[in-house]
Amino acid sequence: MEKIIEEQAQDLEEACRDVPDVEVIHSGSGFEGLSLPQLIHGQTWNTDADHMIIKTSLKLQEVVKPEETGGERNIEEDQHVVRGKGSFTDAETDIAENVLFIYDASHAGYVHLSNKRPLFPTDSDSVREHCLQNSKFIDSSRKSVPFSHLYMRSKEGSIVGPSYSIQYTTGSFNVDRDFVYGLKCEQWPLQANEWILRDRPQSWPGFEQISAISDQGCHVVPVGSHMSHLREFEWRFSFSAAELILARSLADDQKLAYSVLKALIKSEMKSRDADVFASYHLKTCLFWLLEKRGINSWNKQSLGTNVLELLNFLIGFYDEGFVPSYFIGKNNMIDHRSPEDILKTCHALREIRDSVTQSFCRYIQYNQVLPVLFDTSLTQQLKKNPTKFLQNCKYNFLVMALAYILRPIKMVQMNISSRCLESAASLMKKAEILHKATREAGSQEYKELLSALSDALTPVENPTTNMVLSLLEEFLATDKMKVTESSAVALAVFNVFLALHPSHLHQGSETNPLEFHGYLVNPIFKDCFLWAAKVHERYCDAIYNFVVKKWVGGPHLITTDQEATKFMKLLMVILGKPTKQAGAVTGSLFRSSNEGQMFLLTRFLADYLLHVHLECAYVTFQATAFLMNKSVLSEIYLTINWGTYKPSQLRAIELVLSKQELQAELSEEDFTKLIKKQHELKTELSTG
């Protein structure tokens, strides 16, 4: 998701490169790392990104009344002082056409812009006569900055206030993009001086960060206050660039607490009659909380504690009917909402707080992010069978730990390896705690259990796939679960393998073939799929028998190899989809539906298995042939004739030559060509 957002940002910058006097500022949760992608329509992941288009040809200079600078006010002229680089101190000086003066509006956080000398009184008539109307600026900006060619993969956009919103779709991801036009204030505004000067007992943000933020100034965007009768002539200060700096300075745990709470609130508010909440309020609340409490205290607390503390802090703001802007504390961002609406939102947030575990369960169910899916939902388990709920969590922790161990190998990113292993170790310990709790029913109170889970940071040293698989096997043997639940665990392990197993499409296959081959045949991936096949046959053979009996016209996969037979049974269950978990085997860690793509998954799988288990590869080619309504030989020949990775081509030839039933389909000429190609490939690989 991050890569997609960055690519879109680069596309926008490229589009603006030939447009004179334009600068692009990127912000929003997608760039700040402050979001959990939301699943929409059960199919596509969704996040957001904001883009501010800055017209750099216009220069802004702030006007300061004498009483604000210690001088005496001339009531007759309402004389103003101009502040900023190249300030005009002589009222008779000609004003450049590209200079706009900033005058405070009636509401904190908002201003008027005018190209007139700073002499006129800022009453309503003067504002209407002399100040820039924000809608005219928006119209002229849209004409001068053509972005239409960026919307080719977007749904039709909509105009909401000062912004233009589109939904950009690519593959399995949607990005809600908001474009807003604005102007740059080179100097930090006087209205926000209090942010620089206020006392910070916890020293967050630090002096250097405050200086860096204030030195870069801010922006104004063409939107007026809801409380103003001059709204069309007002502009709002925007501190998006400053917020981006602050957000990116946060630790991952702090970002996660905010992201989880935002996701929960947005998900839960859909079914409630309360519309005051805005995610920007929560981000503002996060900054206020960190400033008052300090970031060190948050680093020492569990995720659940941080989420609840942030939620209580937010409720406190709404309770007071005052959500202060972080940079301009006098600006109450909800003063235009009725007390009744604010009260409804307070009530809704308290309900979420009082049932936060259920809210979280509903969120992860809706977004289909659990790798292991039991027959009953998490919320039902939590209400009716807490032991089953803990059991479900335990297996999900272990399967997620497995994914954390495999992911750095798949991504070949050593910089994330240590973090992933720490997460895997923590999840494994949590699973052990939950296993003990379910075996000793009633021995731990719920709060004690949560405390034990939050303390399980990195107690397992050097976690490995074998350690995870051994724990899973031990727990399955003692838990004696339903057949469908044991099947869910085995299939979830296989799905993690399917999502992360090596592929010849990896970028190192040509540049460093020896290193890539070592990665390709790494035994930990083979261990995972063979474990899943073995366990599924041991506990869930009844499901395979059900599929074979009920699937009229289904595939007839054949093999005489013992390990491949177990794998064949697992593959039949995946193709037959008799359970919810079988339907969720999509080769993705993040989605539960991938209709029409199974033939691609089996083709990539077959290509990988050629290198680690030839007989399992043969079974998979049979499955692909069934899905494509082709012969098995023709599917293997696709790899032989069109494959781009020579070792795969060679192994595919070896597979054909190892099977009499496949050789029988070859003409004498085809057989001769196959032997010749085998010789050529061996020669190329030995000399290369």
From Swiss-Prot:
S-S bridge residues: none
Gene Ontology molecular function, alphabetical: 2',3'-cyclic GMP-AMP synthase activity; ATP binding; GTP binding; metal ion binding
Catalytic activity: GTP + ATP = 2',3'-cGAMP + 2 diphosphate; GTP + ATP = pppGp(2'-5')A + diphosphate; pppGp(2'-5')A = 2',3'-cGAMP + diphosphate
Cofactor(s) listed: Mg(2+); Mn(2+)
Entry keyword annotation includes Cell division: no
Domain of life the protein comes from: Eukaryota
Name recorded for this polypeptide: Cyclic GMP-AMP synthase-like receptor 2
Function: Nucleotidyltransferase that catalyzes the formation of cyclic GMP-AMP (2',3'-cGAMP) from ATP and GTP and plays a key role in innate immunity. Directly binds some unknown ligand, activating the nucleotidyltransferase activity, leading to synthesis of 2',3'-cGAMP, a second messenger that binds to and activates Sting, thereby triggering the immune response via activation of the NF-kappa-B transcription factor.
Gene3D superfamilies cross-referenced by the UniProt entry: 1.10.1410.40
Known EC number: 2.7.7.86
Residues that coordinate or bind ATP: S29, S240, A241, A242, E243, K262, S279, Y280, H281, L282, K283
Family: Belongs to the mab-21 family.
Keywords, in A-Z order: ATP-binding, GTP-binding, Immunity, Innate immunity, Magnesium, Manganese, Metal-binding, Nucleotide-binding, Nucleotidyltransferase, Transferase
Binding positions (GTP): D176, D178, R236, F237, S238, F239, S240, A241, A242, E243
Positions of Mn(2+) binding: L290, E291
GO biological process per UniProt: innate immune response
Residue sites binding Mg(2+) per the record: D48, D176, D178
PANTHER family: CELL FATE DETERMINING PROTEIN MAB21-RELATED (PTHR10656), CYCLIC GMP-AMP SYNTHASE-LIKE PROTEIN-RELATED (PTHR10656:SF42)
Family annotation (InterPro entries): Mab-21-like_nuc_Trfase, Mab-21_HhH/H2TH-like, MAB21L/cGLR
